[in-house]
């Protein structure tokens, strides 16, 4: 009887442990999935404002370059590469959320013309799959197939990102025409300086919220500082909280001004945006051009032959 009770107790404990572990996994996975890949998805219906500015610049304040390469023209219902390059110095290390230093991550948003979309896996060639690697692209919104996002992903491996794009066919999509279209891109390297809710991250400079004397600097156990400033005008104490990461620039007893930097700016990344143009080419126009070029070549050949024939006739007449 005692053995049966013991086995029953062990079974209950194992079941409880599995349930707790499963709950922890689900909660952890949910928090991670909600945080990635693009913060802008949480607060903006469209990543490109009416002014042309891509909203990622609201959180990534430093301006850095980005480059996009696409074919000059594509045929309908064709898979092509849109290559986005996010250059940066691979030796750089960024401040992580815990205040430690680590490698930079990168991310990108690609805004395609109407009708263009991510190519289905069965249409992607093995060579293109090799260039894509293990990247997983997603739509900015389920209903917006023309806007693609990726990241954050390790910058050491993916500073060049290849998007596989499928061009539309005007024969099946009446909203698409054979025209020249713009493509917009935004790319960032490193963490942002501001979270979507307006809070500062630890990857930015912190300024004094009052003018006065630094009366106390308390180094917190888990990193960061509490800086007490005695206001010069009324003697009240103001406490500025500095998270782990930025390096302190002031010391106790120092006189500081309002908005004076209390820390260095640890940010080594930034955001950039660019654009390119692509022509959706009508196959019949291409065929017409080829026919025209072929006719020109044939005309030139016949002209040369005719000229040689004429020269032979002249030569024979002279000999006669």
Curated annotation (Swiss-Prot):
GO-annotated molecular function: electron transfer activity; heme binding; iron ion binding
Keywords: Chloroplast, Electron transport, Heme, Iron, Membrane, Metal-binding, Photosynthesis, Plastid, Signal, Thylakoid, Transmembrane, Transmembrane helix, Transport
Details of cofactor binding: Binds 1 heme group covalently.
Residues spanning the membrane: 286-306
Residues spanning the signal sequence: 1-35
Record: residues binding heme: 36, 56, 59-60
Gene Ontology terms describing biological process: photosynthesis
Subcellular localization, as worded in the UniProt entry: Plastid, Chloroplast thylakoid membrane
Family: Belongs to the cytochrome f family.
UniProt-recorded name of the protein: Cytochrome f
Organism for this UniProt entry: Carica papaya
Gene that encodes it: petA
